[in-house]
């Protein structure tokens, strides 16, 4: 049969045998491994992840999320040489429209799957990477715009915190986050030894992270993130208050060799980013329940305090 021939009754509409032979010979001549080396999408992603050693805990957790998704999704069981550009696009569209995954989640998933397929191309297992396209042309970017809050909003919020009977106990920490530009995980990772009160400097060379139930110490997000920053007078006073009011448990908790953390929760465990995110959220909610002029949602994120409204 050739492409123009009609398909006999009871036969499958496969590529004509001559075309299949040409494709096989072409792959052999180009040293492309036949049948995608028998790898499924899940197999390929696992193989790719196995090459990524020395990554951070958060990155490793993200890999696990993608593996779990592909393990349950029929797309993960498909053979990689059968995935076309349109298949890749349709899958991502389904993740958003049917599975209701956010743009940022899909961006992270593709951030693992695309380099996995590129590895197969580089290894001469595939001829093309079906995920080599602009994501924004396929799925809708529903990510919330993030921008720093205004100086006026900052002053309004901090004044409210300082004078509130409940949230005033978090004022020093919130003030430090606003004024130093520290990441929230860098602040929660600070220990007494990181504060040089005599020379008024803050040593930042690690961060306290939580992934699921695992609380651990990690390096700073980037190499330049390791730094020593000066304390201005107002920040110095806030750290003085924190040290004076610090109430550690009888046995100082130790995490990956670090102890002497500055802030503790009601169970005597070092506070993590999640605690402070909740304090910010609840404080804004309380403010907005009292005053007519509303504050936006305020989140300690990265090195700036952002609004997400």
Across the structure, where does each feature detected by a protein language model lie?
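Short alpha-helical segment immediately N-terminal to, or the first helix within
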Residues: 95, 176-177, 309
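Short, surface-exposed polybasic/aromatic micro-patch for ligand or macromolecular engagement
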Residues: 1-35, 222
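Generic recognition of well-ordered alpha-helical segments
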Residues: 19-22, 43, 47, 65-69, ...
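Basic, Lys/Arg- and aromatic-enriched nucleic-acid-binding interface segment
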Residues: 107-111, 126-128, 132-190, 198, ...
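N-terminal core-binding DNA-recognition domain of tyrosine site-specific recombinases/integrases
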Residues: 12-13, 37, 46-125, 165-166, ...
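Short, basic (Lys/Arg/His-rich) helix/loop patches that form interaction surfaces
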Residues: 159-170, 180, 229, 245-254, ...
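Conserved hydrophobic/aromatic pocket- or pore-lining residues that grip, position, or stack substrates
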Residues: 45, 88, 113-116, 124, ...
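Conserved tyrosine-mediated DNA breakage-rejoining catalytic core shared by Y-recombinases
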Residues: 136, 189-247, 253-254
């Amino acid at each position: 049969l050739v492409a123009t021939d009609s398909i006999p009754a009871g036969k499958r509409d496969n590529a004509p045998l001559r075309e299949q032979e040409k494709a096989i010979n072409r792959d052999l001549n180009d040293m492309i491994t036949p049948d995608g080396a028998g790898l499924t999408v899940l197999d390929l992603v696992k193989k790719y992840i196995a090459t990524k050693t020395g990554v951070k805990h958060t990155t490793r957790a993200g890999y696990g999320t993608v593996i779990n998704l592909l393990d349950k999704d029929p797309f993960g069981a498909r053979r990689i040489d059968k995935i076309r550009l349109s298949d890749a696009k349709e899958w991502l569209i389904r993740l958003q429209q049917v599975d209701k995954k956010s743009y940022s989640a899909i961006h992270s998933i593709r951030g693992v799957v695309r380099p996995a397929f590129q590895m197969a191309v580089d290894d001469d297992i595939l001829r093309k990477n079906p995920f080599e396209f602009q994501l924004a042309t396929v799925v809708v970017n529903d990510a919330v715009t993030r921008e720093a809050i205004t100086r006026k909003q900052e002053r309004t919020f901090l004044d409210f915190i300082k004078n509130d009977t409940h949230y005033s106990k978090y004022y020093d920490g919130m003030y430090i986050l606003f004024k130093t530009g520290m990441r929230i995980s860098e602040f929660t990772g600070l220990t007494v030894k990181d504060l040089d009160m005599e020379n008024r400097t803050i040593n930042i060379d690690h961060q306290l992270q939580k992934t699921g139930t695992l609380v651990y110490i990690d390096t700073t997000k980037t190499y330049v993130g390791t730094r020593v920053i000066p304390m201005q007078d107002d920040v110095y006073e806030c750290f003085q208050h924190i040290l004076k009011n610090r109430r550690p448990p009888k046995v100082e908790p130790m995490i990956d060799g670090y102890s002497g953390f500055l802030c503790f929760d009601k169970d005597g465990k070092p506070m993590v980013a999640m605690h402070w995110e909740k304090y910010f959220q609840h404080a804004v909610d309380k403010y907005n329940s009292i005053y007519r002029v509303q504050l936006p949602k305020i989140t300690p994120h990265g090195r700036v305090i952002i609004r997400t409204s």
